[in-house]
Amino acid sequence: MKKIIAFGGSTSQTSINKQLATYAAHLVADASVEVLDLNDYSLPLFSVDLEKEGIPQAAHDFYTKIGSADLLVVSLAEHNGAYSAAFKNLLDWTSRINPKNFQNKPMFLMATSPGARGGASVLEMANSRFPYQGAAIVGTFSLPNFYDHMIDGVLRPEYHAQLVECLASMA
């Protein structure tokens, strides 16, 4: 059985990206799913001065979780066209453990937003950048207008079908 680590790149308690990552991860057959909450990995703002004091345990814990996965299912929040500050900070700290902080793990990469572009800018940025950080991108998916297409925890049929097709193409 495949082990999936899923998370949304946001610390929002009602993160739509965490909802999408959780939904997608549970569509993968024969897999156990562990959903991470970025709030469990609170870190001081990265600086080389703080790094001299040592890498915080939360960064090591997150890095270890990534290493335990057979597949990463990640959906990124878009803040002003980029990653959320909390997620970027987590990447910065874990990159000090290993610059390939995604440890060459297969990653299904997604983004969603309340708007029509569905996090397209952050998805493009991550799809370009994450392979340099050791992510083996196996597929991408963008969901526009989250609140119009995810109703009571279920994607509308056309988007559900697209997501299933994207996930199936990974196999």
Regions found by a protein language model. Give the residues of each.
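Short, histidine-centered active-site or binding-site loop motifs used for metal coordination
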Residues: G8, A111, Y147
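Short, glycine-/small-residue-rich phosphate/pyrophosphate-handling segment
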Residues: Q103-P144
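A short small-residue
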Residues: K2-K3, P106, P144-I151
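Glycine-rich NAD(P)-binding loop of Rossmann-like domains
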Residues: F102-N104, D152-L155
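Mobile beta-alpha loop/short-helix "lid" or hinge segments that flank ligand
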Residues: E34-P44, Y132-M150
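N-terminal beta1-alpha1-beta2 submodule of the flavodoxin-like/Rossmannoid cofactor-binding fold
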Residues: M1-D92, R96-I97, G153-S169
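Short, intrinsically disordered, mixed-charge
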Residues: D92-P99, S128-Y132
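Short alpha-helical linear motifs
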Residues: L43, L109, S128-F130, D148, ...
